[in-house]
């Protein structure tokens, strides 16, 4: 068995990636989220495939086909809710994974970090298009509002929006192409994950202390396979609890009303995992400025490796940076809350203040704190 594992070309690749992989001996549970994201992707592709067997991407029948899945297909309701709530679990794991990378300085692996940002954009695009497919009120109006943002691009904006819509409004052509992209993107994500892992295994994993761990490695199996298994069990327990007890907890009631272009919902909002970016978009009165701020709220992650001026990689021994990090986390939670509120005072003001804090913390306060810590440590 060992002979096959170490010499067969295919088994050798798996062995080097998941069995005999040298891993730091001190990585904590924060390193579990990578494998949990892999599990989420498998769940989403599997449930999505079964949903696609029954779904029809036509404006006249899309809403009815989702109802048919829930009522008439064997265990269709559980497949549908696993897919919808699986997306929420996916984003929870994504945010934790990125948060861990920021806290422990994993962003210094430039290639791995940049592929990760590409993955984040791909997952966000997939989730957005998936939200449009049930063709409820929030699906239709969410698609209309978000795609319309591209019209802020000077000179070519309007043409670009109509090209994406496949007409002069969100209609059958839009739904069909969104379904096609929603189906293909997870497989592109899976390919990007392979590249992400390839670059990660070139350098080896980071660890909580942020110092090289080449002198103290242990094999991935059995130590971290068991650890990842515990994380997977907890994830599945949370997901199934959500699906079986409160499947609509994270959804929007408006999406149980079929799409009606003649009736605008009082408050259009995306899924909860986009609310922080949506709040930043809304906090700027100018349309183009809002779109740029929306894009920068995610793209700013690509700047973090270049803004890192601390002599220590991890925040583990840097209390001032830790304080700022938790300010940033609290700020993102505030933005998420604001994104779900109506556009009126005091929510507008809170959103604007939170947006300023978000950008100034990352672009100004964190680099300055890094320099101050270097000074205090006489480095």
Curated annotation (Swiss-Prot):
Cofactor(s) required for function per UniProt: heme b
Gene3D superfamilies: Cytochrome Bc1 Complex, Chain C
Compartment(s) where it occurs, according to its Swiss-Prot or TrEMBL record: Mitochondrion inner membrane
An annotated GO BP: mitochondrial electron transport, ubiquinol to cytochrome c
Membrane-spanning segments: 33-53, 77-98, 113-133, 178-198, 226-246, 288-308, 320-340, 347-367
Bilayer topology annotation: Multi-pass membrane protein
UniProt signal peptide: none
Keyword check for Lipid metabolism: no
One Pfam family this sequence matches: Cytochrom_B_C
Keywords: Electron transport, Heme, Iron, Membrane, Metal-binding, Mitochondrion, Mitochondrion inner membrane, Respiratory chain, Transmembrane, Transmembrane helix, Transport, Ubiquinone
A cellular component annotation (GO) from this entry: respiratory chain complex III
Binding, heme b b566: 97, 196
Binding site for a ubiquinone: 201
Organism domain of life: Eukaryota
Gene Ontology MF terms in the entry: metal ion binding; ubiquinol-cytochrome-c reductase activity
Main location: mitochondrion
InterPro entries xrefs: Cyt_b/b6_C, Cyt_b/b6_C_sf, Cyt_b/b6_N, Cytb/b6-like_sf, Cytochrome_b, Cytochrome_b_C_euk/bac, Cytochrome_b_N_euk/bac, Di-haem_cyt_TM
Additional detail: Heme 1 (or BL or b562) is low-potential and absorbs at about 562 nm, and heme 2 (or BH or b566) is high-potential and absorbs at about 566 nm.
Subunit: The cytochrome bc1 complex contains 11 subunits: 3 respiratory subunits (MT-CYB, CYC1 and UQCRFS1), 2 core proteins (UQCRC1 and UQCRC2) and 6 low-molecular weight proteins (UQCRH/QCR6, UQCRB/QCR7, UQCRQ/QCR8, UQCR10/QCR9, UQCR11/QCR10 and a cleavage product of UQCRFS1). This cytochrome bc1 complex then forms a dimer.
Function: Component of the ubiquinol-cytochrome c reductase complex (complex III or cytochrome b-c1 complex) that is part of the mitochondrial respiratory chain. The b-c1 complex mediates electron transfer from ubiquinol to cytochrome c. Contributes to the generation of a proton gradient across the mitochondrial membrane that is then used for ATP synthesis.
Protein's recorded name: Cytochrome b
Gene that encodes it: MT-CYB
